[in-house]
Regions:
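Conserved micro-motifs of the catalytic ATP-binding
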Residues: 3-6
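Short beta-strand/loop element within the Bergerat-fold HATPase_c
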Residues: 29-41
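Short helix N-cap motif at coil->helix boundaries in the Bergerat
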Residues: 53-61
């Protein structure tokens, strides 16, 4: 994996937020996978959980300030993913989600090298 020249505190905050979300939205004792993939001009860091999943119609909205998926029982402000997006984009990167109801979620950040 290539070296990344980033604000380590901000990117650590993003990864911690993604991990915290995965833990809070997963069944007790389920596994969470964290990994990194080298691409030609970027490094992808991802967090995969096996929780409830997110309806695809909310995939864009979850990155907006104060948005919370309807019916979510986990406490939160609706700011974590919006702040994560701001931090990642400030580094010239992107953040995204792949998820289906009942199949968990995979959040990834792509940072240029």
């Amino acid at each position: 994996i290539s070296k990344l020249f980033v604000d380590s505190e901000k990117i650590a905050w993003v990864i911690t937020n993604l991990l915290s979300n995965a833990i809070h939205h997963s069944p007790e004792k389920s596994r969470i996978i964290v990994g990194a993939v080298q691409h030609e001009k970027a490094v992808e860091i991802y967090v995969r959980d096996f929780g409830r999943g997110i309806d695809p119609r909310y995939h864009k909205s979850i990155f907006e300030r104060y948005f919370r998926v309807p019916g979510t029982k986990v406490q939160g402000s609706g700011l974590g993913l919006a702040i994560s997006k701001e931090f990642v984009e400030a580094h010239g990167g992107t953040i995204g989600v792949e998820s289906e109801i009942g199949k968990g979620s995979r959040f990834s950040i792509l940072l240029p090298v």
